[in-house]
Structures are given as structure tokens and as C-alpha cells.
């Protein structure tokens, strides 16, 4: 492979689409805390002065949708009407109904192990050894930049920052190996009284330099900090937000394929979410075991059917064993039926709100990031 560039982007927790994702997952967590067997599909729409929460839920739990919504918005940092969006004054509309009984009869089984998939679909999981968290570097560092923006905003280091922000990082590769960072874009909402010069200096010294490894930066690296020159109007005032619109930010930054299904607001019976987590778990363990430098796994399902309709693996020429052997090892060591993968990763619990900003993958706080199968995989592969 010749020299090439690859770019990924991320957005902060205050981005309108991420506000929506976090509200949807906060509602999901509140329900799962009371009823781990609940069926939840929660969608959120945010715009100036209002939040609409809708979807389908089947549960014995009762949760206060309005209070959950306000608390989530408050924690993100929209606490002042000057921003055009305020946790205490925004309208909260609740349009949640019940899940279709036609879906229930396809999913629920007398034997839990035979629980059918909640929908048809295809999901991908990916891992690469180019970072210590076995994730692609572009998305990893794009997340780190907006996470740092949030930290210095909240701890008072840069009190004039506002919650909405976006990052983009372009890495240069030679023969598949990182040789540097070609370009960095960071746009952050700010208070009106901050000059462009002060903002550029503060972002460079307080956000970019502490996050990006110095050995990847050079005299040719290009920096674009608030390139429009002004970012005062942001959040839901600037753009409406909707659950599930940042699926590439949520996963691998475009480095791997995506089946199209969003994650936030969905309980683990929805394989869009749970099987994508399981696929990441499988791919990460294959790479951690040294069976490949890069691994992408696809799994697919039919609604109401427990067994996956297909499993396939791509190692991009980096595999130490054949892909047929890898698939056999996957079937031997991992449970990919909906009930089994939920149990394998302990997914029927309130862990989802923290996934809804800064990436679902590459953070060791989540069970699908464990590499506890790597040793057994390596042994059974004969390496």
C-alpha cells in the first residue's frame, strides 16, 4: 500500500445529535435499572427550547421522562437561557408507546436461549493494532480532542467554552503504518466576548498539544481552529438533533464498514446494538491474540431467529491463520445468539448513557472491550 491519508471526525457531548443520543440512553438506563428484561426503543429530537422523546417501550418500570431529560441536558452543560437551550426551561414532550405484539412474538421464547433477534440486519465489528486500545488512530484521537474540550470547559480552565464542538483528524500512512498527522480541525462553541486570536492560542495549548502525540506533529501539519472565525450560536439553536445520526462517530470513524443500524435508545434485544458490541468483542480478541493485525467481522440476523444467518471475517492480508480457521474459532469461543451474547457481555443493565458520547468502542470501561478470550484463541489456533 502506498502513502495515503485517512480522516475521522468526532463531536462533543453538547452536539445536538449527541444530546439526543444521551437522552435516549439515559431513558434506557433508567428503565433497565428497574426492569432488566424491558424492551426499549427510545428516540429523541431536540431543537431550540424543546425536546421530543418518542418510541416504543414494553416494561413494568415507571420512569420520569421529563426529569431524566432535564438532568441529562443539565449534566451536558446547557444551563443558561442565553445559550438558547436550557435544561430548566425547555419543553419536554413525551410520545412513547408500546412495542408491537407482532415483534414480541418473534423475539420472546419459553427457552430464553432461543430468543429470536429483534430485527433483521447486518453488523460489523473491527479492531486494529495501530493503537493500544486496538482502535483506528484517527477516530481515537478525534474523540480525545472533543473529550478534552469538555474537560477544560467543565473544570473552569477555559470557562468561555460552550458545550457544542467538533473535531477532525487526518492521519498520514505509509504501507499501512502511521507516519504523522496531516491535518487537525477543531471547532468549538464559545462565549461572544472571546477573540479569535485568544481562542486559537487557548485551544492549541490547552486542548490540541496535550492530546496529540508530539512525534506525529511536524512543520507541515495543518491546523484549522474555528475556521469560520466565529462559533457563538451552537447546540440545538444552531441545528436540530436526532438520535442515531452519528453512527460513524459512534463506531470506527469510517475505517470499517457499518451495517447502518444506530445504537442509542435500544435495549440489548436489538441486535443493531448488542451484536455490534459482540462483533467488536470478537474482532478485538482476535487482534489481541495476535491472529491478525486488523480484523473486521460481519454477523447478520433474521427477525425472530436465534442463530446468525451469517458470520464472515476479513483480515486485509494480515491474518496469521486462514479466515476459515478464524470463523471456526469464533463459533467455538463466542456466543452470538441474541440471548447468549447479552449474557456473555452482561448487557441487561444500565450501562448505556456513558456510551452515548465519545465513542462506543476503545474505552475499557465497557465489557465488550475485554480481551479475556485472546489467550484461548491463540492456543486453539496453534500459535
From Swiss-Prot:
A biological process from GO: one-carbon metabolic process
Record keywords: ATP-binding, Cytoplasm, Magnesium, Metal-binding, Nucleotide-binding, One-carbon metabolism, Potassium, Transferase
UniProt-annotated binding residues for K(+): 43
One Pfam short name: S-AdoMet_synt_M
Record-listed ATP binding positions: 15, 164-166, 230-231, 239, 245-246, 262, 266
Pathway: Amino-acid biosynthesis; S-adenosyl-L-methionine biosynthesis; S-adenosyl-L-methionine from L-methionine: step 1/1
CDD domains given in the database record: S-AdoMet_synt
Annotated spans, Flexible loop: 99-109
Binding, Mg(2+): 17
Superkingdom of the source species: Bacteria
Compartments where found: Cytoplasm
Cofactor(s), by name: Mg(2+); K(+)
Subunit relationships: Homotetramer; dimer of dimers.
HAMAP family: S_AdoMet_synth1
Function: Catalyzes the formation of S-adenosylmethionine (AdoMet) from methionine and ATP. The overall synthetic reaction is composed of two sequential steps, AdoMet formation and the subsequent tripolyphosphate hydrolysis which occurs prior to release of AdoMet from the enzyme.
UniProt record similarity statement: Belongs to the AdoMet synthase family.
Name of the molecule in the record: S-adenosylmethionine synthase
Protein source organism: Shewanella frigidimarina (strain NCIMB 400)
